């Protein structure tokens, strides 16, 4: 005979589910080293000893020009690459070299963004109850969440969660996850950190793999942090955004279009030419499922924090939905000034939007 469990929703439990999570602070950080996209092809082919590949170099230059990215911040410097020549070939075994750099640098870059968010929040660091750390690379145990706990001096009792290898999906996924944590843990103040360093994907050119050139042109390094909680304390905390609902949709038969695979040579990248059109063709169905419960069907009536995988994606989605030029402006600006920051990108865009809103109010 199966046991029977009776659960009663008490007044205290009911209150726990009232109200939405609020984003209370945002901080961003980038490495001091940066590259100009206009001159990057010359640097890239020189540092990888590939200047003899003239046609390939010109092809890469065209890709960089079409990307509409102006600058990218990178941890990788010429000095570091000269010390690690195995990073500059296409397929030499180099995972150990990459890991040694990432395991050290990812938490440090995350700390910079976290400190800015904590400073803006204005509350004692001891009030942070949860930490969620996200990165696409640098897998280690204890993880970057543990290292950041030490770097920041968080309470030893802080509840930690480490998310590895989530890629561009992770920015929105972190918002969804932190909403659940903040709303279902009374008094929670959750620190979320997305720290991305693209060393794992850097490598020399290959005559057979054009996808690799796109990867070398597209991704930048950066970290972003946010503090989220429910029921902000008047006069002590200032909410920036309200997280009303979250949704996620898998588009069937699309998993072959975008793939990243961790190998001895680092993280390999495949992106089919169909990605922009596949996203554009399916985005409205996803929006309908997410916004229909709220009676919203005018896509120009809402503000957009759209992850800009690349300019072709932004252009196709904008055209498909008939969006005005200002709807995706923040996404375009972040892509132009930083490149694709994978999980950190969405938080950079949120930061850009709140800054613009504050400026408009003035």
UniProtKB/Swiss-Prot annotation:
InterPro entries: Chalcone/stilbene_synt_C (IPR012328), Chalcone/stilbene_synt_N (IPR001099), Chalcone/stilbene_synthase_AS (IPR018088), Polyketide_synthase_type-III (IPR011141), Thiolase-like (IPR016039). It catalyses: (E)-4-coumaroyl-CoA + 3 malonyl-CoA + 3 H(+) = 2',4,4',6'-tetrahydroxychalcone + 3 CO2 + 4 CoA. Its EC number is 2.3.1.74. The active site is at 168. Keywords: Acyltransferase, Flavonoid biosynthesis, Transferase. Pathway: Secondary metabolite biosynthesis; flavonoid biosynthesis. PROSITE patterns: CHALCONE_SYNTH. It holds the Pfam family Chal_sti_synt_N. GO terms for molecular function: naringenin-chalcone synthase activity. GO terms for biological process: flavonoid biosynthetic process; polyketide biosynthetic process. Belongs to the thiolase-like superfamily. Chalcone/stilbene synthases family. The primary product of this enzyme is 4,2',4',6'-tetrahydroxychalcone (also termed naringenin-chalcone or chalcone) which can under specific conditions spontaneously isomerize into naringenin. This is Chalcone synthase A. It comes from Ipomoea triloba (Trilobed morning glory). The lineage of its organism: Eukaryota, Viridiplantae, Streptophyta, Embryophyta, Tracheophyta. The gene is CHSA.
């Amino acid at each position: 005979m199966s046991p029977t469990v009776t659960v009663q929703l008490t007044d205290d439990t009911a209150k726990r589910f009232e109200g939405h999570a609020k984003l209370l602070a945002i901080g961003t950080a980038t490495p001091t080293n940066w590259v100009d996209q206009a001159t990057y092809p010359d640097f890239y082919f020189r540092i990888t000893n590939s200047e003899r590949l003239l046609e390939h170099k010109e092809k890469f230059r065209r890709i960089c020009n079409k990307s509409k990215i102006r600058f990218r911040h990178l941890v990788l410097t010429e000095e570091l690459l000269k010390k690690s020549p195995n990073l500059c070939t296409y397929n030499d075994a180099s995972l150990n070299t990459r890991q040694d750099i990432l395991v050290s640098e990812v938490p440090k870059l995350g700390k910079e963004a976290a400190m800015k968010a904590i400073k803006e929040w204005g509350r004692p660091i001891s009030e942070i109850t949860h930490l969620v750390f996200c990165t696409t690379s640098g897998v280690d145990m204890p993880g970057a969440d543990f290292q950041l706990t030490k770097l920041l001096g968080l309470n030893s009792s802080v509840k930690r969660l480490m998310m590895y290898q989530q890629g561009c999906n992770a920015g929105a996924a972190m918002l969804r996850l932190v909403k659940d944590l903040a709303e279902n843990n009374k008094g929670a103040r959750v620190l979320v950190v997305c720290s991305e360093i693209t060393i794992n994907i850097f490598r020399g050119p290959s005559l057979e793999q054009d996808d690799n050139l796109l990867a070398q042109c597209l991704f930048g390094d950066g970290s972003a942090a946010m503090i989220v909680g429910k029921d902000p304390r008047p006069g002590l905390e200032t909410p920036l955004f309200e997280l009303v609902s979250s949704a996620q949709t898998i588009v069937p038969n699309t998993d072959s279009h975008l793939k990243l695979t961790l190998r001895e040579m680092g993280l390999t990248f495949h992106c089919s030419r169909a990605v922009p059109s596949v996203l554009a063709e399916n985005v409205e169905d996803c929006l309908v499922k997410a916004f229909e419960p709220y009676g919203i069907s005018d896509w120009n009536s809402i503000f957009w924090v759209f992850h800009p995988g690349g300019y072709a994606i932004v252009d196709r989605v904008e055209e498909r939905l008939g969006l005005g030029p200002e709807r995706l402006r923040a996404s375009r600006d972040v892509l132009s000034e930083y490149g694709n920051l994978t999980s950190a990108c969405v938080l950079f865009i949120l930061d850009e939007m709140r800054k613009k809103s504050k400026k408009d109010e003035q």
